[in-house]
Structure formats: C-alpha cells, structure tokens
Amino acid sequence: RLLESHGFSVAILAQPDWKNPDSFKIFGKPRLAFLVSSGAMDSMVSNYTANNKPRSEDAYAHGGEKGHRPDRALTTYVGAIRQAYKGTNIIIGGIEASLRRFSHYDYWSNTVKRSILLDSKADLLIYGMGERAIIEIANQLKDGKSAREIRNVRGTCWYTGKESDIAALQNSTNMSFPDTANLSFPTSTDLSFPYSTRESCEHKDYRVDPLIKPEDDNELLDSDNDTFDKKQFIHLPSFEEVKNNSPESKQKYALSYLIQEQNTDAINADILIEKTDSRFVVQNPPAMPLSTEEMDKIYSLPFTRKWHPMYDKLAANGKSGIPALSEVKFSLTSCRGCFGACSFCAITFHQGRRIQSRSHNSLVEEATKMTKDKDFKGYIHDVGGPTANFRNDACENQKINGACKNKDCLGVNPCKNVKVSHTDYVELLQKLRSIPNVKKVFIRSGIRFDYLMMDKDKTFFTELCKHHISGQLKVAPEHVNDN
C-alpha cells in the first residue's frame, strides 16, 4: 500500500511453489525488483518446534496446512527467482532477513551461519521496519540504479568483494534519506542531526575508523549539506573468527553481538562491517523513527484486513484462509519499538528501543472502521505493540542523543531518567471503549509490569483489571523466574 501511494505498481505473489521456478513467472519479470520476505515469522521457527520436531500445522499457510513454506524460505525463494529470471534485482526484508543480517547462531543446525544476504545471493537487504528504506530504494531503482549499486540508504545492508569499496567509506559519509513528502514524511533536511562526541564501541582487537576528523566532531551541520552524518566505521569480528565452537570464537561472537546491539539506534548507531571470506557485509545505520504523523498516515492506507485471494484458491482439506489472521484481524497497533531490553527478545534488534506511537484520533478512526466489518463481534482483541504500556520514549535524552549504548532503561536497577506515565494510554483506552458497538477492549500485548509498578498513579492498574483483561493478564515472561 505504501508503494502504491507513491505511484508504484505492486504484484503480490503469495506463498509460491518454490519447487517450480515457473510459479515465480505468474506476473512476469518486474520492472524494478523482486521484494522477497518469508512472512511474519522466521521460516525455521514456523516449521519446527524448540525440540527440532516438525510442526503439525502452519498458522500462516492456507487452511493451517504445513509444508507450504520451505525451510530457510528467503534463501530458497531467491534461488528460485534467480532460476526464473537471471540478472533481476532481488531485495530481501522482513523478520528473517533482519535477524540474520550478520553471522548468526542457527539453533536448528547448531552452527553459526553467514549473513543471509550472502547465503541467499540477494542484492540488498532491508532490516527493521522498512517504510523509509523501501520508498528511497524504489525511487533510486526508478532512476536507473541497480540494487547492487544502492549503498547509501539507512536501514539497509549491502555487500562487496572489493576492499577498495570499504576504504572508500572513509571518504564518503553522505547518507541519503527518503524524501517521502507525499505521506507527510520529513524530508532529508528534517532528518539530520548534529552528532556530538560519544563513547564508541572500541575493543582491543577491532578497529573503529572515524569518518570525520576529531576536531570537527562538535561542529554543527553545514546548512548546505544536511545529510552529512558524522559516523564511525566499526569492524566486527569476521565470520571466520566467530564460526567455530572454541571458547575464543564464542567470546568473539558475543563481542560481535554486543557491538551490533549497541548500534540499533538511528541517532547514534555507526556503520558496521563484517568480513566473510573475501567479501564484506556493510550495515548502514537504522532508519530514523517515524513521527506520530507518519505512523498515522501509514496506518490510514487502505489495508483490507483480509488474506490474499490466492489462499482461497489453494484451500486445503476444505479449509481456506490464514488461521493466524483471526488473532490480529480486530487488533490495533498503537506503538512500535521497546526499551524493555529483555535478553531473549529480538524486538530491539528489529524495531529499536525508541517508541513510535500513533495518535488517539488515528486509532479511534481505525477502530470505528472495524466496527462496520460484518465479522466484528464487538471485541477489540488488542491495543498495543511490542510492549502494550509503552507509548512514549523512555526519556527526553533519547530524542536528542538516541538510546544509551551502554545502559538499559529498565531491569534490576532502572535508570533514574525513565519517565513513567500511563496517562496517555489510559485516555486512549477510554476513548476506544466509548465507541458505539464496541463491547470490550482487551490488551493482549505483553504488559511490562515492572514499569507499571514504578507508576505511583494506580489508575492504569485499576482500569486494566476492570476492563482490559481477557481471561489472563499477558506479561513479559522474563520476570517469572528469579534466576
């Protein structure tokens, strides 16, 4: 829908038959690129249990029938596209691409795998929530660039086999930002920030090459060069160094992930480089967070809340549709991002720690439209996001300097600067409850209850218990065990 709103035509090929390259030719060769995702869940998580046993069903496939999505779906899909159309642009994105963008431990094979950008042989990878990146990339493709030539967009990873390309980064810090004025997105000028000196991720064996002279570090941006980003150039441990099972290799793997985790904020993240054999994977800094106005505009686009019609034609065992849709069809996304820092969770790596939220009017309008759906029974299943009760940034400092690299907002010793308030969320829930034909508004996203307990105003807790629990309170599971 976002691409359509910018004048691009999009054909959706839903869950193609990966065993038959001709199934990727249904719509012909795209003018600009194939945009490939494995869906809302990593394909290995979708296909296997934690005990490495095949799952009996796939809630994201037609009729819930298993076997319609391949293992390591992105790599398989890209390979099939390459067979069907040699030389076409292929860009990967979504949760599987985001979480596997560098060398990563793969639970199912019990090995460290290379970046999925290299394994899949795609041309470009979009990580995180890709609205800004995809519009900028589409515009550059329209202007005649190939996907392999696009190296200056936030929220993307690219690769090269030339050391000279890596060396050239030291002389090129002009990051290009999407100009999406048609959606009231900020222009590149609005997205520029002056960067001040800060502690970097310097470690003994891995160099951090400054892309600017130290004496220039505190200068304000030149008004004629508003996209000039003062970034550093950090070399991660190479794939060769992290792939083995030795203690030294594991330490370097942990170090690599630490550096990656410290560079998930759009304001203070640096450019990360990982060498694999003779190639280099380069991660540009994350896309800038969306403003409330931008979030509202995106969620006002004409989404249907229905599965792709192709799934009706592929009905399995007399069943059609996507079972997973029933859980979210009448839910509202009120926010993105999370500063909870749960050690097991990948949200920060995908959406970042900054909270991006929609306005009350936007959510009320969407809820009102839902009440007119013939399948709506009066129940809004969820109003939330990664963490339901986060509606604003953790502190004012995040808006200026980004989330702290070496300090968590919550945890055993919460930061004293965390602003605790549920007032905005309470007012939003009250407005949603008052909409005609709405019987109940439930919260099924996780409640971060240590944050809740920090709030001296108990209004939200009272409202939560009286109006918004559908059987059991949903909480973040990292708090249930003292160990």
At which residue positions do the language-model features occur?
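Conserved alpha-helical substructure of the radical SAM core
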Residues: 351-379
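Short helix-loop-beta junction
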Residues: 1-10
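N-terminal pre-triad scaffold of radical SAM enzymes
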Residues: 3, 315-346, 379, 472
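Flexible loop/turn segments at secondary-structure boundaries
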Residues: 19-20, 42-44, 97-101, 133-135, ...
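Glycine-rich beta-alpha loop elements in corrinoid/cobalamin-binding modules
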Residues: 14-276, 283, 288
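Conserved, mostly hydrophobic/aromatic
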Residues: 123, 298, 363, 475
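Conserved SAM/AdoMet-binding glycine-rich loop
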Residues: 17-18, 368-483
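Glycine- and acidic
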Residues: 59-64, 99, 120, 279-281, ...
